[in-house]
Amino acid sequence: MSTRGVATRKNRYFDSVFLMAVARRLSEQRGVETAAAVMGSPANKKILIDMGFSGQALDLAGPNDLVVALEGDENAIRAVTENLEEWLARPKSELAGGMAISLDDALSRQASSNLAVISVPGQYAAREAHAALDHGMNVFLFSDHVAVEDEVALKRKAVDSGLIVMGPDCGTALIGGTGVGFANVVRRGPIGVVAASGTGLQEFSCLVHRSDSGISYGLGTGSRDLSDAVGGLSTLTAIDALEKDPETAVIGILSKPPGESTLRTITERLNRCSKPAVACFLGLVADSLDGDARFEVCATLDDAVAAALRLAGTDASEIPASPADQSAILAKGEAERMAAGQMYVRGLFAGGTFCYQTQQVMRRSEIIVHSNAPLDGMRFLGDPQTSIGNTLIDMGSDEFTVGTPHPMIDASQRAKRIAAEADDPQVAVLLLDFILGYNASADPAGDLANAISNAKQVASEAGRHLSVVASVCGTDGDPQDLAQQEQTLRDAGAIVFASNVRASSFVRDIVLQRAEVTG
Amino acid sequence: MATLRSLMEDGPIAINLGLVEFAKALRDQKKPAIHVDWSPPPPADQEMQDILDELL
């Protein structure tokens, strides 16, 4: 008979990635059925209570306290809780090269520090970022849930000091060939990028690399920078820097649509920029710029890459390895193999920008989709756990990541959702993104290969043909090996494309075919 | 005292607070990165800090 136990440690902080690894190792112990290791935030405690855990230790745990919850054989649980410290010890190799006890201690060891990389919980992030700026460092602020007034204060302070705050909610930067955060191994080249979206910058830089060109600098700004509340403070700083940078020949700007007045500010700034520029404001209605722009405005990341390459005058090869020219024929072939009633796409995305961009591809063909992050004109998916018709889900959004790592690191939620979608006889095609590079999962394709092949098999046994379409954002230099990742997906039965736009266009063709067949 | 320009010219010389993986990835790219063993301020300190922030 199984039992439940909860152990806590007061004022012991561990990050969610480390705790995920602890929970995974615990759950592999003989006799342990369920294991969770989280900080005792209200949201995490609610998840544990919903899982059936209870008791005084859990009730008293606060956000600064560690909570380990276990279900299974009584002896197994006792063995873990009596030796909890051993389970919480970090491998010594992780700390090779020195660890400081504070920002001041770190600065005393490395006085030339020029960048603070901050990923602490959001409520503490602004204070740490202010301290870094006060010490004369630029800031890469990965943390989210930072108040917008804190963001504005930080960015104003940075402007006054000739520094930049990349973030909050900044996933990626490329600083002269070095990736910060979630970044790919990309060669240096003539194209400089300013990006409000981490995955947008990753996709753009990978496609530039795969076209034999390169990136001078990719400066993140955080997802809210071009809102009217923030006014593009970091974007303007980054444009100034890239305009002065001798290595940069072309400047690309990637973002969701800016606020109205910020769009005017950015348009005016790019119009007087001495270097050619390309803007991709995903989801922007075309006439919002009123013909004012004296720079290229592109609807998709792929179009922006093509424009930037052309403006840079590079002799770039076309983005390789996609059966694009045969795409429509292949889509028709896939659609013809499907059973009556198979009509819809279910897109399960690790990258929020990909969820957004796929909706844009669908909107152009007047295909209505439901999403937890809907583009203008699309429908809001009230319960993100339950798909309706065509559904595209950003699985990196808050409702999926409270208490668990991002799907770029941990594929378990996507694996479960793939299985659920495969059981739905109305589903024609699954659309998935795979993001390689530093700090992503060591094997993103391998993490979901079984889920993909099982989904296809379940559908097949029910007399259906389920298409699985994937895009892989990565380069040949990435630690995960792009070619191997693509092959793993093909072996699992997926059709693989080199970009999200190409995969989305293929899926759109299938959906249109199925709508035609089923009337 | 760094600037954005010096970051771009010298490359990242980083101090990392939070996910240790970010420091490890920089070191994998042969860039200096010191990881800070960060933990949240105790709740009492937090309240006091908020009061000080208000006053200052």
Question: Where are the predicted features?
Answer:
Chain A
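Catalytic-core regions of core metabolic enzymes
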Residues: 2-519
